Amino acid sequence: MVKKRVVTAGTFDILHPGHYEVLKFAKSLGDELIVIVARDETVKKIKGRKPIIPEEQRREMVEALKPVDKAILGSLKNKLEPILELKPDVIVLGPDQTTFDEETLKEELAKYGLHPEIVRFKGYKKCPFHSSFDIVKEIIRRFCNKEIKI
């Protein structure tokens, strides 16, 4: 039996419930979920800052999550390289991923003979800390209000 392979990608810097929701959703679409974790250098180029957690630690944490079968580091040369190697049946984009829109990604992959289903996750359950940025803001707020003592 051929397994249906699902791939998603992200930074995963400061894991939070939103990450977990995307990963559960992605796993529900197939038999095998492989996650591409962004390299530190790539994050710096896209977000203008290095991630807080180093890439290998982020990869290990993501791979330890129940929905994930395997986590790999992305390519420094070509963002599409891991996708071209993995040949997924489904690609899941997070709600805030803007590097590619669905149509552009389809067109790029078609040039290589790949035609995966591309799905954008839209089902965030709103919770107080569904983004790394919200977590950092709350830590700063509590620290400034002296609710956190170091």
Swiss-Prot record:
Binding-site list for ATP: T11, F12, H16, P17, G18, H19, D96, Y124
GO molecular function list: ATP binding; FMN adenylyltransferase activity
Pfam families: CTP_transf_like (PF01467)
Known catalytic reactions: FMN + ATP + H(+) = FAD + diphosphate
Top-level taxonomic group: Archaea
Transmembrane residue ranges: none
Sorted UniProt keywords: ATP-binding, FAD, Flavoprotein, FMN, Nucleotide-binding, Nucleotidyltransferase, Transferase
Entries under InterPro entries matching the protein: Archaeal_FAD_synthase, Cyt_trans-like, FAD_synth_RibL, Rossmann-like_a/b/a_fold
Root EC class: transferase
GO terms under biological process: FAD biosynthetic process; FMN metabolic process
SUPFAM superfamilies given in the database record: Nucleotidylyl transferase
UniProt EC number: 2.7.7.2
Pathway membership: Cofactor biosynthesis; FAD biosynthesis; FAD from FMN: step 1/1
Cofactor or coenzyme needed: a divalent metal cation
Quaternary organization: Homodimer.
Reported function: Catalyzes the transfer of the AMP portion of ATP to flavin mononucleotide (FMN) to produce flavin adenine dinucleotide (FAD) coenzyme.
Family: Belongs to the archaeal FAD synthase family.
HAMAP family: FAD_synth_arch
NCBIfam families (alphabetical): cyt_tran_rel
Protein name listed in UniProt: FAD synthase
Organism of provenance: Methanocaldococcus fervens (strain DSM 4213 / JCM 15782 / AG86) (Methanococcus fervens)
Classification lineage: Archaea, Methanobacteriati, Methanobacteriota, Methanomada group, Methanococci
Gene giving rise to this polypeptide: ribL
